[in-house]
Amino acid sequence: MSLYSDGLSSDQYFLVNFIMSNYLGPDVYSDNPRCSSSQRLARGLPPYTLMHIGSSSLTVSQLQNLYYNVLRNAKSSLLLHPDMIYMYLKGYLPLEPSGKFPQFTHFFPTNLHPQKRYSPSHEIVKGIVVIDDPAVGFINKEELQRFRCLSRLDDLKIDRVTSLSPRVNLDESRETEQDCSRNGDATANGVVTNEDYNSSGELQETCKRKEGEDAVASCVISEPERLSGDIPESQGMKQDCSRNGESAFSGIVSDQDYYSFVKLPETCKRKNKEEEAVTGHAVSGTSKTPERFRETYKRRRFKNSSKKATNKNGETLMEREKTDKPIPFSSEMKESDAEPSVVTTGTASKETLGSSVGVVDIGVNKVAYFFQVALPGVRKDYGEFSCEIESDGKVILEGSTTRGEKNIKRHSRVFEMNIRKLCPPGPFKLCFNLPGPVDPRLFSPNFRSDGIFEGVIIRHKNS
């Protein structure tokens, strides 16, 4: 059944309405413990006014995160686009007939729970709290059974902190945060085709790099004979992988995705000729390229070379790699390389060299504070990183670093790090103070993929 012209189904409407009315409740002083909106209606509790409501509040992003976390096991066809959820929170969904279907503002009217917008990405709803364990005794049995069937949840209890947190994906192969909001597109009715969402609750573009890697791997397996040419090694060069006459992916080539080869002058010339001859069929390497293809490509490259480069000892490149031994250094050279000088130019020359972790920038606004902290190599997954803010403005960051190892394995080789300037791996704790007192409840964090942790927090009214 469709509730309006854009195709919102009754199941989709039922789920969003059930979650917002049973997992949220007004912050009424007399309700101890706090009750959900549906529970108050079922129990016939007296109405409340602004004088009875506490100072608790939730951001719109947290409400969206709550919706997606509760429906983490549901079918993707039942999930709504964040824009649709935002319209529901505002009471703007064009449901027909009008007034028959309650929306968020029916349970939390704006005259008692005002929605204030501090910035384009920071909007709060005042006077509401999360109910982590809804009382099922006050829920209609048919509605409860329908919700359990659609959400695939047997237990309605949730974790208060996790339910309001964004569902972050971590790409373990690169140890970087991937903001893969979805692997499909939102349809016209606002249905999302995946279950992964980013920290702001807003759906981003599909993870193009991940799709591209799959396309490249398929292209390599299906048509290996078209890949006999040399693959570009330089980072930043963009190529197009074409499969069955259609362009599949355009990505950035990374040095670490290939074995280390020595560039020969004739190789560079041959690359230019082959690129002109087979435009659109060159493949950019990815970490998902099959190992057997890389070995085949490696053997074919040296086999097809009409002239093998030799060093002064008469060893070819293949022979040198087979008999790869450490190059002896004189004691003077070792001493000179023990403490290399670091020369910086451009904007980097204006920075003060020091620890790579813990550099802080703080911004001040009339209503809020903004800070950025450099945390390169810090784990982002749950349980490994935490941020606590006290009312006096003290910020405490705790986590663990993954860089600075003594031995590093790259390209089937083990390197012993003689010079180590990065922070060693292990737990750390970082504390700094904001210029004034703040309201810890009104905090919007964001851990960026480039290793910068930033946050916006509302200042205390009296500060």
Curated annotation (Swiss-Prot):
Coiled coil: none annotated. Residues 169-182 have a biased composition (Basic and acidic residues). Residues 184-199 have a biased composition (Polar residues). It comes from the Eukaryota. Induction: Not regulated by heat. Residues 300-310 have a biased composition (Basic residues). It is found in: Nucleus. Keywords: Nucleus, Transcription, Transcription regulation. Interacts with MBD7 (via C-terminus), IDM1 and IDM2. Part of a complex made of MBD7, IDM1, IDM2 and IDM3. Acts as an anti-silencing factor that prevents DNA hypermethylation and gene repression. This is Increased DNA methylation 3. It comes from Arabidopsis thaliana. The gene is IDM3.
